């Protein structure tokens, strides 16, 4: 048995889009077959059926109504699938054989433009990447808005990952032979990004002609060849999927990576620039605080400003001056914001114009939006700052487009452009004439109905219409005896009625339907002419849209500054960051008003180059460091900042090493990740950079960690090519001695108050180093059981008392019912490597529940002494010969509620924001109140 003609056609089409789910149009449905059907039925929760196709077994099949396709397509694209739309290319009724079909569009995560599935305040970027020896280029496009950006640099994975993190593309287009290890790295860091591959030749083919035809501002001698390749590859992919050239992509914007403040992937995450650390949502981020925009365009632009802070003093100060002028003209600012609220998403509407998918209602939204532009231009003329004056000169009021739309389109047109009811009366004589004929015909129908009711005496008689039978007279069966014989021609019999026609009725039907059909055709033709005129002027509307989005951003920054009592920072060239009474912009928004403790900061490249911060955990060191970085970023985007006074030097890069989770899947421990991040910072930071280092060396033994932290500080301060402004938080109090030995190191600590054996974190950063870490007190605040806290204090006293003796003796408390006795003789301990070769490993008792204590002071002694470790157990048959070098174990059988302890052990505090830490602490305290 051979394949059916339809199935043969399906397989031929499928061959050209193997990586897509094929939506194959059959009548009023899109059908999917074979593996596509299995995937779609699972993802969309559709019933999987079968169809005879000429093979031995029925082909798996499922389908969806074509008019509801957008919803299903959106769900599949959101899940990362590509969809190929195969349409009927001819009228089935006019086709003698099998209907001609072809793919009209391929929808991918990076080329999807349905506004119902796009975030209005976030771009939907697609990226291309091209690698040539040691150089690479990247291009980013959003086909829904028409943006197209390109850059190039020396190839470093870190640089590429930073740009991916900045633009957050939904899809990346790569050359098909690129190394799989590089693709693996991308997928590992960004698992939700879709990867697509094209041939090498698609990056090169007809490169200059393609770019010249697409971009109004393209000059072949202006761009490096490698830049043109990534741009050409991306244009090829867009054309391949959209099946036409998009006129809204008409300008290529080249940017240099070094023209903006570099914030690497880890720093964007740690500083919570656009999403919070834990939930990966906007709330709790810097963007969340600063975004008071009134338009979708402004929301996207503000995100770009925050993702790409400036490093040139003049544009920064231009923005700051504009924000200041808005704050000095509150009434004018409010009028401006009120008009902004009435502006729709101009960029995405004209994007739909370019893709021929715009409807009449969206053009009415466009009309209403550009109708506000003359008022905005008038407001701009009232300002004096350079930025606003330039905007006032450049903004196009688009009055000709507004006039056309206002004259041509009904205020409330049909949603579908192929159903008529679009064109306004008086715009076209033929439309008016046909509408009159249609109206007169319907009046005739109404008069016919009244006449028949009167002449037959049937009050329930109706003249109705449907698409199958046209116009007809309907009479219920109860009244059939009243119908005069021979008056009507029977057309259809229903269960409770009869339907009739008359020659006169059918004649009028032809006139009415002819007028309606012709009217719909003419209205659609006029609509396409209007759409084409708008398409010819897309670049004008895009320029105006960009100015409106900039105005919206400035108004947003002014609103936030007013609401939160921000001040205008001074931008200096002294390599000095001086902040008086600075506040963390996010934390102060999520705690009760007035409770945030402000702090001063002074960092430069001379006497105050490295600020060494000591103090207990949870006291606010990390919050303070993040606060300095966020204030710097805010200043460089042109925002006012949360402080009493701020003098900010422009930074070229911001690096952070704050917390890390074990990357076990990649075979990297916390310490390995930490060292990799520190290495990256030391290799790439400059004297213009701001570096935040938190607890460097914490992931290894005390002496190793202390040595590494010490060496890092020396390298930063003594390397003439580095000397970056640095905030360095540590629990190694020994490092405070470096202030006397290394120029530029200054000791600071978090103030703590002790009252009746209780500690209170004052959150105030003060001059001088801390003399202790208060680790046990922090554990007590976290809700650890009293026996654990008391025993820890005993152990600490032993350790501190034995510091000047030759041995460390710790006898376990009897209340733990432990038989272990641990004696560590300081004179006989060897180094960690020697110990590991001398001690045979065994297992600890499996009958007891063990809790690991990793006290750094204990580990210090265990790793540095040079004698044999002896573990004696009174009730055991043999002496255990294994003792972990980096920790020792104590049994806690008496603790009944070990689930709470297990929860404490599993807290990933390194990846918590300060506010999340406080909430977790409160939760643990409540859970442990009943534990003795």
Swiss-Prot record:
InterPro entries: DNA_mismatch_repair_MutS (IPR005748), DNA_mismatch_repair_MutS-lik_N (IPR007695), DNA_mismatch_repair_MutS/MSH (IPR017261), DNA_mismatch_repair_MutS_C (IPR000432), DNA_mismatch_repair_MutS_clamp (IPR007861), DNA_mismatch_repair_MutS_core (IPR007696), DNA_mismatch_repair_MutS_N (IPR016151), DNA_mismatch_repair_MutS_sf (IPR036187). One of its GO terms (molecular function) is ATP-dependent DNA damage sensor activity. GO terms for biological process: mismatch repair. Pfam families: MutS_I, MutS_II, MutS_III, MutS_IV, MutS_V. ATP binds at residues 615-622. This protein is involved in the repair of mismatches in DNA. It is possible that it carries out the mismatch recognition step. This protein has a weak ATPase activity. Keywords: ATP-binding, DNA damage, DNA repair, DNA-binding, Nucleotide-binding. Belongs to the DNA mismatch repair MutS family. The gene is mutS. Gene3D superfamilies: 1.10.1420.10, DNA repair protein MutS, domain I (3.40.1170.10), MutS, connector domain (3.30.420.110), P-loop containing nucleotide triphosphate hydrolases (3.40.50.300). PROSITE patterns: DNA_MISMATCH_REPAIR_2 (PS00486). This is DNA mismatch repair protein MutS. One of its GO terms (cellular component) is cytosol.
